[in-house]
Amino acid sequence: MTPSVNTADTDLHTTVFVLVHGAWHGSSQWAATQRALAGLGAASVAVDLPGHGFDAPVPSGYLLPGRPGLLTERSQLADVTMDDCADAVLDTLRRVRRYGRVVLVAHSAGGGPASLAAERAPELVDRLVYLSAFVPAGRARFFDYLGAPENSTAWGQGLSLGDPQALGAVRIDPLSPDPVYVEELRQTHYHDTPADRFDRWRSALSPDLPLAVPATPVILTAGRWGRIPRTFLRCAEDRALPTAVQNLMIAEADRAMPGEPFTVRTLPGSHSPFAARPRELAEALVG
């Protein structure tokens, strides 16, 4: 049986799932999951965080032969803040609240903006779902968990390009012509997605994650974020954010905010179930 988020206390047809992507992704990567949700009778809307999706700016040499400046050109997203990202989530939450119950779902680095949005307006969220996502309740910055010993087995150490501080972004090269780099990207984030399909997924990624997303502290309180029921969907074979660090975030959040401890479920597979098993993911979300 597919693990599920508890929606037994409500009519699914009055629930809206708000989906927040992670680093380098966009709303379009949720499309297969949204189709599966619709088939199950659930409404959903996917958010594009600032600097992501089809409007994402790219370095000037990104599509040119030799990729001039890719390692050094400062990102156009360098001035994007965590507040900007949370505002994008809040705007969507406010627009859908009138339709009924709202479940806010965050993947990976999207956990920071989603958490801050929930902290600012807990009345707009009925349940939080973290899909192998950053939970700032125990440690305020995503970098604090990425640098933890529990994350030492993570893959993808060779993916980041240049100096993030100088670039103002964590930059990768989804369109790299280097097959070794491309395979590292696939093995890190999409290892259970067939290689021929992965080329389509990587072509939709954008190169820059605003540095503010992993570097900005997100301060949560028990009276606001901590009062919202929450679920963590672990990805069992996650190579980008190993289960050890997922478990660390869960444990530290529950110690810091014990009033609404996590309901924990486990999905099989990689960091990106929206690519490899969208129907299973949808079933886990709706219950």
Place the predicted regions along the sequence by residue:
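Short, surface-exposed "cap/lid" segments of acyl-processing enzymes
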Residues: 11-13, 17-58
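Post-His helix in hydrolase/transferase enzymes
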Residues: 273-287
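Active-site nucleophile elbow and catalytic-triad environment of alpha/beta-hydrolase enzymes
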Residues: 200-224, 228
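Short beta-strand/loop motif that positions the catalytic acidic residue
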Residues: 232-234
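Conserved loop-alpha-helix segment in the C-terminal half of the alpha/beta-hydrolase fold
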Residues: 236-267, 280
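Flexible "cap/lid" loop of the alpha/beta hydrolase fold
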Residues: 129-172, 213-214
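Active-site loop/oxyanion-hole signature of alpha/beta-hydrolase fold enzymes
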Residues: 49-103, 119, 145-147
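Conserved hydrolase catalytic core segment
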Residues: 100-144
